[in-house]
């Protein structure tokens, strides 16, 4: 079974026991969180159930593993012949979570 969840401004396709990196969520490592915005639930042998826009009653439970920072992204700006160079780096804070359970709604 898999699900598509929305957290932050992104959508993620998750399955049970999968480990994903999402935008930073406050919480200690080891604590559990629940995602209520489930956009789609599906099984590999059956047709998928797509929400309008979310699946009512469905939820995904996850456990926080780590609070991390992604790899550095370099932003470099230059204007030729003007001696203008600007180099900056940015590391986005992310949360690594493990999907524990996908709960279907009664109408799925």
From Swiss-Prot:
Gene Ontology molecular functions: rRNA binding; structural constituent of ribosome
Highest taxon of the lineage: Bacteria
GO biological process: translation
Name of the gene encoding the protein in the UniProt record: rplU
Protein name per Swiss-Prot or TrEMBL: Large ribosomal subunit protein bL21
Keyword field contains Ribosomal protein: yes
Taxonomic source organism: Orientia tsutsugamushi (strain Ikeda) (Rickettsia tsutsugamushi)
Task performed by this protein: This protein binds to 23S rRNA in the presence of protein L20.
One Pfam family, short name: Ribosomal_L21p
Entry keyword Ribonucleoprotein: yes
Family, similarity comment: Belongs to the bacterial ribosomal protein bL21 family.
GO (cellular component) term, any one: ribonucleoprotein complex
Keywords: Ribonucleoprotein, Ribosomal protein, RNA-binding, rRNA-binding
SUPFAM superfamilies named among the record's database cross-references: L21p-like (SSF141091)
Binding partners and assembly: Part of the 50S ribosomal subunit. Contacts protein L20.
């Amino acid at each position: 079974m898999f699900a598509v969840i929305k957290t932050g401004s992104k959508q993620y396709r998750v399955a049970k026991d999968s480990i994903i990196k999402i935008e930073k969520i406050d919480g200690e490592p080891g604590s559990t969180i629940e995602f209520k915005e489930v956009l789609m639930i599906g099984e590999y042998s059956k047709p998928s159930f797509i929400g309008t826009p979310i699946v009512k009653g469905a939820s995904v439970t996850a456990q926080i593993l780590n609070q991390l920072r992604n790899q550095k992204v370099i932003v470099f700006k230059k204007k030729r012949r003007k001696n203008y160079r600007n180099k900056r780096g940015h590391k986005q804070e992310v949360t690594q979570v493990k999907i524990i359970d996908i709960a279907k709604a009664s109408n799925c």
